[in-house]
Swiss-Prot record:
This is Ankyrin repeat domain-containing protein 27. Interacts with RAB21 (GDP-bound form), VPS29, KIF5A, KIF5C, GOLGA4. Interacts with RAB32 (GTP-bound form), RAB38 (GTP-bound form), VAMP7. Interacts with low affinity with RAB5. ANKRD27:RAB32 heterodimers can homodimerize to form tetramers. Can interact with RAB38 or RAB32, VPS29 and VAMP7 simultaneously. A decreased interaction with RAB32 seen in the presence of SGSM2. InterPro entries: Ankyrin_rpt (IPR002110), Ankyrin_rpt-contain_sf (IPR036770), UPF0507/Ank_repeat_27 (IPR051248), VPS9 (IPR003123), VPS9_dom_sf (IPR037191). Residues 233-371 form the VPS9 domain. It comes from Pongo abelii. Residues 1-372 are annotated as: Sufficient for GEF activity towards RAB21. May be a guanine exchange factor (GEF) for Rab21, Rab32 and Rab38 and regulate endosome dynamics. May regulate the participation of VAMP7 in membrane fusion events; in vitro inhibits VAMP7-mediated SNARE complex formation by trapping VAMP7 in a closed, fusogenically inactive conformation. Involved in peripheral melanosomal distribution of TYRP1 in melanocytes; the function, which probably is implicating vesicle-trafficking, includes cooperation with Rab32, Rab38 and VAMP7.
Length: 1050
């Protein structure tokens, strides 16, 4: 409702009410009623004591209100509806509401309304309803601005001094300069706390913009308008020549209707005031008043819609010819190019379009003194078409530029901005910069007054520069172009926001990093006291928070408060952004600072989880304060492990104090990089390591970074040069791809630990050492296997990482994978030749660890690949000794080794195919998403009472039919017959069968007859591979019933 504001204590109507009827003031306070007060601008004359003040005092009754003299009034939304008792049932807008108290602390409300309740019929009243949202005179502006105008005067004085030096610059330069002055003054005005609150309402913001524009232009009018007049002098002379030749033109010659002739003298007098107006806004108001006068009839006011476009344009044509204004072109140029407070789409813009169309019609020579019958209407049609075209052309050159920036059209943006370069080329061709000879005048005359030229300093009606728009729309590719063209990185809009503010508000990390690279200040506060970090925390953009903090913690000012005293940590805690809170606390944000409500970030946390995180850091913060020297000592101890690229000699030459500072700085930079890798923040990693787009595009062309082979260490031949360049490249920040932290962790190590499969190829491509060890002598492959990150393990192995390296505990990657139960990783390691029976410092093999951790599938996989069950650890225990009795693992340890041993005489290739056919393609399958079936092959044990003499078990190995059998043997054999082999004659049959197929590439599986359904229980599953039924070990002697090994092909 509060779209308009004024001091009601100075309102003439309210003052008259207090003066003439104090009894009504007392009564309305006693009954807590409502007083209706017309706004100041709607009161045409002094208020008389005979005014019916009772009609403006409202008393609530049931569902409506009554005045003190018994008239009905309804309040519906933001309008007053007059009811019974009033002669005219008007609807009056409510502008705002205030509550007043008298000396007895009795309250009553005042509703400021747009105009009085009585209908006005006198033609002497204002021509249109008073617009409370516009300022008309410089006196109104000075009253509105108050003391703020004194601050503007200093900026204006500076503008006067610099204008003389740039007088020969182009029109666009002066447009941008005047706009910059306007923006600076508006920013100063919006720093006022009261006006800042009002500015949140669009109408109030427009009022402030009008006030600043009128005041600024009034003070620089002589400079700017004189310059524009000089630029448009030749155009004005040509137009004046035409209008002078039409002085005999009569109204009837151009079809002016008689009903509109009456107001032409008044409109002519009003139009003559145009050159007395000192701002575009005032000139437009003058033109609007002319149009209103034209449309007013002698008896009553009529709306603009009652006059058609032809009627209006006929009158305007007559006024343009008959009014003595010699500089119409200068006025048009001034109004169009120096109006900053609003767009051309409002009522004032329509009035300007009408005059512009009429002027263009006259310039074309279409107007003559002939009667309309002989003139023809072809030219009139042109007039209407021109007016329609002008009304549609609402986009200024600046608007066009901003649209192309928003859409990322780099080619068009570059074309528009390169127009200014032509002006510079023209100046270079002049005799000298101040030359006025004919040749030099021809060079510059066509470009100096061209308003279509745009620059990186052009602004829209929000105060945004092109760089603001690029940041707001996330167009990182245009940041470089705009900065190279001279865009001001720290330019501020009307609300004090820089491009960095907008990028952080919208969450564009790449834009944020680019702006920081071009020295954008992270310390700038907008009108609300917010830094870019405040906005990134408010909107929860973790990536932007990290970009600001990691770039430079000191310049980011983590503990600065906004106008409410809130630090970024207050905001992140209030909205529950845990990751942002941790980032801020890790980099030194204080949890002790209080805002203006005496709240610490801890008190702002409304979430119990966030509160626990804050409290944990709060306790550590207190401990750090008590022992502040500990971190420095720790850093000093690890000076040599912070960066592989550091220079030992430079550190040794420093003093102890400077060494600690350098160590602290290097450590912080490394931690930034490692945290970005841990978070998978590719943009931040790229920025810190200074990778380019080409580096990412070539990511798939990763070469091995493990011991690259060169012709000689310094070889630069075509084969060695790419790898040499990659290994030698170190960013200017000193951060290399193999830099390490205190504990020896490198970026590749952290990426492997956190499973960042997208970063691993990039790190390896840029020279990361896959064989580098940390403080525990572990390589990245150890960590990836321990955490079960299959894709990371695959990438490292494909880059020739060694699968059998041991750490300080003697553990290999295979032992870690088996201990964690990561059967997919185990299969992959075995395929790459991992040693299966290697022991760690405790003597445990991979099989020991899998048995101890009870990972059934891993145990089966190891056994099928020949893991020994006889190896003793340092406690003299085998894997069988570590297994629980009567468990599935125990049955596996007893059954599978004998089954595998029975196949020892089979050809090696066939045996591998037989037991690992499913494992080979594990990493290429996407069918293992179900949590209850993590690996394709599962074992089921079914006990049969009639087939075994002793305690035996039967194992059925079922496989998923949806996974194709892609072994090399299966590709050559379109159909494989089911075979059956008895255990007692397996070697002999295998040998004879191999002899028969001596010329075959792949020996066939020993033939085994498949048992019928009545002889065994088979768990039904879709299968592609062979199902193996193995016999358990014989404890007391040979089994009475031979155990059959059967393979079924589905």
């Amino acid at each position: 409702m509060a779209l308009y504001d004024e001091d009601l204590l100075k309102n003439p109507f309210y003052l008259a009410l207090q003066k003439w009827r104090p009894d009504l003031c007392s009564k309305v306070a006693q009954i807590h009623g409502i007083v209706l007060v017309p706004c100041k601008g709607s009161l045409s004359s002094s208020i008389q004591s005979t005014c019916q003040f009772e009609s403006y005092i409202l008393i609530p009754v049931e569902e409506h209100f009554q005045t003190l003299n018994g008239k009905d009034v309804f309040i519906q939304g933001n309008r007053i509806k007059l009811g019974a008792g009033f002669t005219c049932l008007l609807s009056v807008p409510i502008l705002f509401e205030e509550t007043f108290y008298n000396e007895k602390e009795e309250s009553f409300s005042i509703l400021c309304i747009a105009h009085p309740l009585e209908k006005r019929e006198s033609s002497e009243e204002p021509l249109a309803p008073s617009d409370p949202f516009s300022l008309k005179t410089i006196e109104d502006v000075r009253e509105f601005l108050g003391r703020h105008s004194e601050r503007f005067d200093r900026n204006i004085a500076s503008f006067h001094r610099t204008f003389r030096e740039c007088e020969r610059k182009s029109l666009r330069h002066h447009i941008d300069s005047a706009n910059a002055l306007y923006t600076k003054c508006l920013q100063q005005l919006l720093r006022d706390s009261h006006l800042k609150m009002l500015a949140k309402q669009e109408a109030q913001m427009n009022l402030m913009k009008q006030a600043v524009e009128i005041y600024v232009h009034h003070e620089i009018y002589d400079l700017i308008f004189k310059y524009v007049g000089t630029m448009e002098a030749s155009e004005d002379a040509a137009f004046n020549k035409i209008t002078r030749s039409l002085q005999d033109l009569q109204q009837k010659d151009i079809g002016v209707k008689p009903e509109f002739s009456f107001n032409i003298p008044r409109a002519k007098r009003e139009l003559a005031q145009l050159n007395k107006c000192t701002s575009p806004q005032q000139k437009l108001v003058c033109l609007r008043k002319v149009v209103q006068l034209i449309t007013q009839s002698p008896s009553q006011r009529v709306n603009l819609e009652t006059m058609c476009a032809d009627d209006l344009l006929s009158v305007l044509l007559y006024l343009l010819v008959k009014t003595e204004i010699p500089n119409w072109m200068a006025n048009l140029s001034y109004i169009k190019n120096f109006r900053f407070s609003s767009s051309a789409k409002d009522e004032l813009g329509y009035c300007l379009t009408s005059f512009e169309a009429a002027i263009e019609y006259i310039r074309q020579g279409s107007l003559s003194a002939k009667p309309p019958e002989s003139e023809g209407f072809g030219d009139r049609l042109f007039l209407k078409q021109r007016m329609s075209l002008l009304s549609q052309m609402t986009s200024s050159p600046t608007d066009c530029l901003f649209k192309h920036i928003a859409s990322g059209n780099q080619k068009e943006v570059e074309r528009l901005l390169s127009q200014e370069d032509h002006d510079k080329d023209a100046v270079q061709k002049m005799c000298h910069p101040l030359c006025f000879c004919d040749d030099c005048e021809k060079l510059v005359s066509g470009r100096l007054n061209d308003p279509s030229v745009v620059t990186p300093f052009s602004r829209d009606d929000r105060g945004h520069t092109p760089l603001h728009v690029a940041a707001l729309c996330g167009q990182a590719s245009l940041i470089d172009l705009l900065v190279s063209k001279g865009a001001v990185v720290n330019a501020t809009d009307y609300h004090g926001a820089t491009p960095l503010h907008l990028a952080c508000q919208k969450g564009y990390q790449s834009v944020t990093l680019l702006l920081l690279h071009y020295k954008a200040s992270a310390e700038v506060q907008d009108n609300n006291g917010n830094t870019p970090l405040h906005l990134a925390c408010t909107y929860g953009h973790e990536d932007c928070v990290k970009a600001l903090v990691y770039y430079d913690v000191e310049s980011c000012r983590l503990d600065i408060g906004n106008e409410k005293g809130d630090t970024p940590l207050h905001i992140a805690a209030r909205w529950g952004y845990q990751a942002i809170i941790e980032t801020l606390l890790q980099n030194g944000a204080s949890p002790e600072i209080q805002n203006r409500l005496k709240e610490t970030p801890l008190k702002c946390a409304l979430n119990s989880k966030i509160l626990s995180v804050m409290e944990a850091y709060h306790l550590s913060f207190e401990r750090r304060q008590k022992s502040s020297e500990a971190p420095v000592q720790s850093l000093q101890r690890s000076v040599d492990s912070i960066s592989q690229e550091s220079s030992t000699s430079s550190f040794s030459s420093m003093s102890a104090g400077s060494r600690q500072e350098e160590t602290k700085k290097d450590y912080r930079e490394v931690e930034k990089l490692l945290r970005a890798v841990a978070d998978g923040d590719l943009e931040m990693v790229r920025y810190l390591l200074e990778w380019t787009e080409e580096d990412l595009e070539d990511a798939e062309d990763t070469v091995s970074a493990v011991d690259p082979e060169f012709c000689h260490p310094l070889c630069q031949c075509p084969k060695c040069a790419p790898a040499q360049k990659r290994l030698a490249k170190v960013p200017a920040s000193g951060l290399g791809v193999n830099v390490t932290s205190q504990d020896g962790s490198s970026p590749l190590y952290v990426a492997a630990l956190h499973g960042r499969a997208d970063l691993i190829p990039l790190l390896l491509k840029h020279g990361a050492n896959a064989g580098a060890r940390n403080a525990d002598q572990a390589v990245p492959l150890h960590l990836a296997c321990q955490q079960g990150h299959f894709q990371v393990v695959k990438c490292l192995l494909d880059s020739n990482a060694k699968p059998n390296k041991k750490d300080l505990s003697g553990n290999t990657p295979l032992i870690y994978a088996c201990s964690g139960g990561h059967h997919e990783v185990v299969a992959l390691l075995l395929q790459h030749g991992a040693a299966i029976n290697t022991s760690n410092n405790k003597g445990n093999t991979a099989l020991h660890e899998a048995v101890i951790e009870k990972h059934v599938f891993v145990v089966e996989l190891l056994l099928l690949h020949g893991a020994s069950v006889q190896v003793l650890n340092k406690r003299q225990r085998t894997a069988v000794d570590c297994a629980e009795q009567n468990s599935k693992i125990m049955e596996l340890l007893q059954v599978v080794p004998s089954c595998v041993a029975s196949l020892d005489d089979v050809a090696e290739t066939d045996r591998k195919e037989y037991v690992t056919v499913k494992i080979r393609k594990k990493w290429n399958s996407k069918l293992y998403d179900l949590p209850d079936e993590p690996f394709t092959r599962q074992f089921y044990f079914a006990h049969s009472a009639g087939q075994f003499k002793g305690k035996t078990s039967r194992e059925i190995m079922a496989r998923d039919r949806s996974v194709p059998n892609l072994t090399e043997g299966s590709l050559h054999e379109p159909g494989r017959q089911s075979v059956t082999l008895r255990q007692n004659n397996l070697p002999a049959q295998s040998g004879s069968h191999a002899a028969e197929k001596g010329n075959s590439d792949w020996p066939e599986r020993p033939r085994v007859t498949q048992t019928g359904p009545g002889h065994r229980r088979m768990l039904r599953r879709h299968t592609v591979e062979d199902a193996v039924v193995s016999q358990g070990p014989e404890a007391a002697g040979p089994l009475s019933t031979p155990q059959e090994v059967s393979a079924s092909r589905s």
